[in-house]
Amino acid sequence: TEAKELGIHFFVLTGGEPMVRKKDILMLAEKHNDCAFHIFTNGTLIDEELCKEVQRLGNLSFALSVEGYAETNDDRRGQGVFEKVMHAMDLMKEHGLLFGTSICYTSKNYKVVTSDEFLQMLVDKGAILSWFFHYMPVGKDASTDLLLTPEQREYMVERVRFVRSRKCPIKLFTLDFQ
């Protein structure tokens, strides 16, 4: 309520994993139906029941974390997570929900996650946007080997801009979050 008094009507929810509180999020979205909520999630807790509620409410959108195809994604996010995210995308598309992806790119996956094939797969799944975040070495599994070189970074800047441009046949709104 204080935020609305300040003129703020768009909220971004991040984690940990915000969907562990999905009942609270749905209650918040219903109470504040004049606001929009964008949720960054790993996608593993998205199910049919949630999709029906989100469809009914109409003021939530999602960014699902994905870091490449199954092997690459699951190496970083856990075994079977890629398939769960693909299933979540299928459910969201089936219910006409607004969603995109959140992609952490590294020196190992940056070409794959910006390839025509990968991006078209996301569009075919129903994604309309992709947030790109460069890898930051923090936490117990931090690795400086995953940092991009200046040349790789320049490639990402140019590629993300190209995909977002009208010259690209892939219709996906891309943002490189710096």
Q: Where are these predicted regions, by residue range?
A:
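Gly/Ser/Thr-rich loops at beta-strand to alpha-helix junctions
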Residues: P18-M19, V138
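A C-terminal junction/extension of Radical SAM enzymes
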Residues: Y135-Q178
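Radical SAM/AdoMet-radical enzyme domain recognition
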Residues: E2-T14, R21-H134
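Pocket-edge positions in alpha/beta enzyme catalytic cores
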Residues: E17, R77, D145-L148
